[in-house]
């Protein structure tokens, strides 16, 4: 009987791996370094070795393993193929990951998903949106990632770009260039790096306005802390950031009408100083029937990816 499954969240520094029961119970989790040398040529064999090593340690036969799910930091086609180069994996990409890894594992079934989409799948299965059929997750970290789940299914899109929420255009007059090459992407305003960039711009534009952050090296967390403590200029940046994000979420709500929005990533740890104005701005922009859509913190944290990867395997 196939009672077990593995979930892998492949990142640029480490791969997080979880051994699960097919019911969703996490039995054990660990990490292995991601070897990005030589365009990541050893990545898949290292993942295979990690899974096989754990199977040997636990005395598991292939016949007991339902499959291995993998979340990767790039577009995925047909739950199998990574069609482009992934920059933060040393140029690794253009692989039929499912086929290649399955062969290395002696035929164990492998399915692959974009890491942000997979994290959303984890949250809707065992996290903040448990019990929902449709939900959208936004991850606010160094960039802005996203995952869209409709009727229990990840929306990958024709080109594997479904859920690229961070690259919704929110300011067509922006002159600064996003990492994707476009101008005015949500990521430029609502990511951790975007908050810092915009805060520095506010400081430059308001040289006579007192601010506790002036003359310091600060991170996004410091901006939210300053706003919480009554700093008017930091509060202005938080208001502008949440206004932009609220507008983007309202656009998504009018497109897919989810039961819930989940917000994760390091920026989400700011708490209500982020969520309270975000909900208010969302209501201003949202279509009337969507205005009360809940916007809540994601709860699985760094484990969302391994949960979602396993969900690819165990399905309904």
Positions of PLM-derived features:
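Short beta-strand segments
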Residues: 9, 69-73, 113, 137-143, ...
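A charged helix-plus-loop insertion that forms the helical arch/lid used to bind
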Residues: 81-93
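Adenylate-forming
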Residues: 120-125, 146-148, 167-168
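Structural signature of FAD isoalloxazine-binding scaffolds in flavoprotein oxidoreductases
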Residues: 161-165
């Amino acid at each position: 009987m196939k009672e077990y499954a593995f979930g892998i969240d492949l990142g640029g520094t480490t791969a997080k791996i979880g051994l699960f029961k097919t019911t969703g119970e996490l039995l054990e989790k660990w990490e292995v370094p991601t070897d990005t040398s030589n365009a990541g040529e050893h990545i898949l064999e290292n993942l295979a070795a990690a899974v096989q090593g754990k199977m040997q340690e636990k005395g598991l036969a292939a016949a007991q393993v339902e499959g291995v799910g993998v979340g990767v930091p790039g577009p995925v086609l047909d739950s199998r193929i990574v069609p482009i180069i992934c920059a933060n994996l040393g140029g690794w990409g253009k692989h039929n990951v499912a086929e290649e890894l399955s062969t290395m594992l002696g035929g164990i079934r492998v399915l692959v998903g974009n890491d942000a989409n997979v994290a959303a799948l984890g949250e809707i299965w065992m996290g903040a949106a448990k019990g929902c059929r449709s939900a959208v997750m936004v991850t606010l970290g160094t960039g802005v990632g996203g995952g869209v789940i409709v009727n229990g299914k990840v929306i990958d899109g024709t080109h594997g770009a479904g859920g690229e929420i961070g690259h919704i255009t929110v300011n067509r007059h922006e002159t600064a260039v996003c990492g994707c090459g476009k101008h005015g992407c949500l990521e430029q305003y609502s990511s951790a790096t975007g908050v810092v960039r915009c805060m520095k711009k506010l400081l430059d534009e308001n040289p006579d306005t007192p601010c506790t952050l002036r003359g310091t090296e600060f991170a996004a967390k410091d901006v939210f802390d300053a706003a919480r403590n009554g700093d008017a200029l930091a509060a202005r940046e938080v208001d502008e950031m949440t206004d932009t994000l609220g507008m983007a979420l309202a656009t998504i709500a009018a497109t897919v009408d989810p039961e819930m929005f989940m917000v994760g990533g390091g920026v989400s740890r700011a708490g209500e100083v982020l969520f309270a104005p975000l909900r208010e701005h969302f209501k201003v922009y949202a279509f009337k029937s969507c205005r009360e859509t809940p916007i809540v913190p994601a709860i699985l944290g760094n484990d969302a990816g391994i949960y979602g990867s396993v969900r690819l395997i165990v399905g309904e």
